[in-house]
């Protein structure tokens, strides 16, 4: 089966005199794999995602989406995206929200009647009759994912899917991601909640200053008795110039 995403030697900067926003990034994403793209603010994660989605062109290197250029509409139709804070009309119900997006996808009435209940059931919203304005944050996140998979994508990009969720909401979203993986959907996850990434991602790439400084399977890069957060913090501190690190009297007071 063909790979989902292939990124090879990717470089991008926004102006000729600027430093590289992305500098030599290489990784691949396969069907049914959950891949975590991690890094502090300004590391270049969003730029990489925009290039994969065909919203930006790289300056150097090669990016393929399902074996094609990311700008190819045929490739992009197999891509779904769920933002951190999905926004839907507050007085619609979940089924009505999906019906609206199904019409934008060009699905005929018969296909909509089949696909919408199927998608709502997958997202655990099939029995929900309340309007969106009455939804919890977690329910809105699940509706956002439902909208993103309505077109049956082979790649789903999730931006901070568990941010600001309570433990039950995070559990529901994790379960949904696991079901997507089991169905063969590849998931590209951008999140600062490293404990969540560690639980759902097979592979991660940690970025700093536009470069991937560590990439591999979670089980391989996180030593026994340590956490992904431990590894992340050590790597980022090792690549951050001393002048940009917190003064010792501040860092010493940070919670352990």
Each predicted region: which residue ranges?
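Conserved NTP-handling cores and scaffolds of large molecular machines
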Residues: 105, 204, 225, 236-240
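Short acidic/histidine-centered micro-motifs embedded in hydrophobic/aromatic stretches
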Residues: 119-122, 224, 235
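N-terminal low-complexity Pro/Gly-rich stretches
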Residues: 227-234, 238-239, 245-247
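Short, leucine/isoleucine-rich alpha-helical interaction segments at C-terminal helix-coil junctions
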Residues: 142, 152, 235-242, 253
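ABC transporter nucleotide-binding domains
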Residues: 3-5, 12-189, 194-208, 213-214
């Amino acid at each position: 089966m063909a790979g989902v995403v292939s990124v090879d030697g990717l470089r991008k900067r926004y102006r000729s005199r600027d430093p590289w926003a992305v500098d030599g990034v290489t990784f691949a994403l396969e069907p049914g794999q959950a891949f975590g793209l991690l890094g502090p603010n300004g590391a270049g994660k969003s730029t990489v995602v925009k290039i994969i989605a065909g919203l930006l062109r790289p300056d150097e290197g090669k990016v393929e989406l399902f074996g094609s250029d990311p700008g190819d509409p045929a490739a992009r139709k197999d891509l779904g995206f769920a933002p951190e804070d999905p926004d839907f009309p507050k007085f619609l119900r979940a089924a009505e929200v999906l019906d609206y997006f199904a019409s934008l996808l060009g699905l005929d009435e018969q296909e909509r009647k089949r696909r919408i209940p199927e998608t709502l059931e997958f997202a655990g919203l099939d029995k929900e009759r309340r309007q969106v304005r009455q939804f919890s944050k977690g329910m809105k996140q699940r509706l956002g994912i439902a909208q993103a998979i309505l077109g049956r994508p082979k790649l789903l990009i999730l931006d901070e899917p568990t941010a600001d969720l309570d433990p039950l909401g995070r559990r529901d979203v994790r379960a949904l991601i696991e079901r997507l993986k089991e169905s063969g959907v590849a998931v590209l996850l951008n999140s600062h909640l490293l404990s969540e990434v560690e639980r759902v991602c097979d592979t991660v790439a940690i970025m700093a200053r536009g470069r991937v400084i560590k990439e591999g399977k979670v089980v391989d890069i996180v030593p026994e008795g340590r956490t992904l957060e431990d590894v992340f913090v050590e790597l980022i501190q090792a690549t951050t110039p001393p002048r940009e690190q917190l003064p010792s009297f501040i860092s010493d007071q940070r919670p352990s």
